């Protein structure tokens, strides 16, 4: 798999039941939040959502990749969810990616390594939206079912950098990640998906590192800030970003080099680079 497309066949979150409405319509007022009970309760809701989405898979012979909450440092929860999936879907648990928002970029990397022509993808995570007081409100668990498929013309992943980060301010990893991207890329970056949300200062540390990309960006570089529109949706965020990257005419008709920055507090920071390729380059 070089160039790829992402097709979302089912999208189910407390905020919207349609991915295009969520991306392109006026932002709806968020529903009333629900009381966060515990991660154990959230895991149970993730299992319920997984059963709902798995039942809608059309071709179960394709590889299936699960994009799941970033539970890197929560081994008990990770093992609980993995064990439940193995009991429910014993033939479809080879690829469980507990990376949250960065999982979708890891998915592309995996698809290239495995030389898949097409694969099923299910993303599940907790979702949050900012209220009128600019505080995150828990909405519940959301999920999406999609496919990733080889394309002759489209976006090709050229790099994927990932680093654990306990604290964005004290342990900022984006400086090193951006420096590596500059070393490995010579093409001008004309589109950046950035993770800031305007609520917590630590979420905008990517801005302080932007100068490291000065040789690759300029005043014409376009920025997408999905957290403002989508809220915090974890593993769903990465999938939605790739769907927008590969399907939006405003993007595919105008941009050639995209950078997708992902991060989750107390978890990780990451960035993936995508280059638009034509059929001639693909061949």
Residue ranges of each PLM-predicted region?
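Conserved "HGTGT" condensation-loop signature of ketosynthase/thiolase-family condensing enzymes
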Residues: 1-126, 134-283
